[in-house]
Amino acid sequence: METSPSPRHSAPWWALLIVGFLCGLLIPMACGNASGPTVPAEADGTPSQQPQWTAPYVPAEMVFADEKVDLRRSDLHERMDRELITFTYGHTLTMLMLKRANRFFPIVEPILREEGIPDDLKYLMVIESNLVPTIKSPAGAMGLWQFMPATGREMGLEVNANIDERCHVEKATRAACRYLRKLHAQCGDWMTVCASYNAGPAGIASRSQTQKADNALDLLLVEETSRYMFRVMACKQIFEHPRLYGFHLAASDLYPYIAPAETVTVTATIDDLPTFARDHGCSFAQLIEANPWLRETSLQNKSGRTYKILIPDTAALNYDPTRTSAYHREWVE
């Protein structure tokens, strides 16, 4: 026998329609707020923990080595923009270079000044080596200034298995000054010198003649050299305005320049440098860090040449943030 459904178990059609409408409205709202209310990250006074990506500032013009560079032209602006983005967001290496500069610029800047080389050329050294005095390229270039063996010898450096003065900060810098002067005599301006340092003077001269270009920035070059000139300028821009690009350091964050305790003049062979180091109150590792041009555990000197070996001040090697000062005030807050 058929029976009709009870009114208590059946809802009118309009009630079902209302329930469906409310579910369609409320469920997305609930899901959308699952992570909390949409309020500004700093509304409660705490700093935002989310990364913030902003486009780095690109100046309209720069002065590099006393030569004005106009960056308002779109292609030059974009090339500079690329390198500033790379340095800004490749921040690990940029931060390390800023820290290391406090150790090496006190040695390098006075030499550039004495040799008559514009101070801005130190940034060429920064991008060549990231301020690691023993760094070696796959092609065999070595040291802060990345000399190839033949070029190093041509500029007066001793380069062999026992001694590699490309890693001697002072001697390599003076050799770099000689080489930069030679390039400037050939090129006539410092931006072309930078391009020639990377690609070789013959190649740049040939392209300048073929392309009938008066400015190295207007040359059609391989990407590495084309970027190289802007990397040097971008490095200068960030080193002179670090906070503008998000680098906030205190003086205690910088790596200090540690003057040697003494300098020992050597004119004979030293068969055992580890013993020599111990006799002078330091470890062999500390001796090599102070004299990275020494390549082995002995110093061979059959010709009686004069070498000056720096003896590190082991007491000064202890980290003391109160003793670290910034070589350039613009690096720190």
Regions found by a protein language model. Give the residues of each.
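Primarily a LysM-type cell-wall glycan-binding module
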Residues: 252-284, 305, 332-333
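Extracellular LysM carbohydrate-binding repeats and other cell-envelope/extracellular binding modules
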Residues: 286-330
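Short conserved micro-motifs at the rims of enzyme active sites and ligand-binding pockets
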Residues: 243-244, 276, 320-324
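Hydrophobic alpha-helix feature that most strongly marks membrane-spanning transmembrane helices
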Residues: 237, 278-281, 285, 292-295
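Non-catalytic surface loops within mature trypsin-like serine protease
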Residues: 236, 268, 313-315
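Catalytic glycan-binding domains that act on GlcNAc-containing polysaccharides
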Residues: 71-255, 294-300
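An acidic, Gly/Ser/Thr/Pro-rich helix-cap/linker signature
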Residues: 2-3, 9-116
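Generic alpha-helical secondary-structure signal
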Residues: 175, 196, 279, 287-290
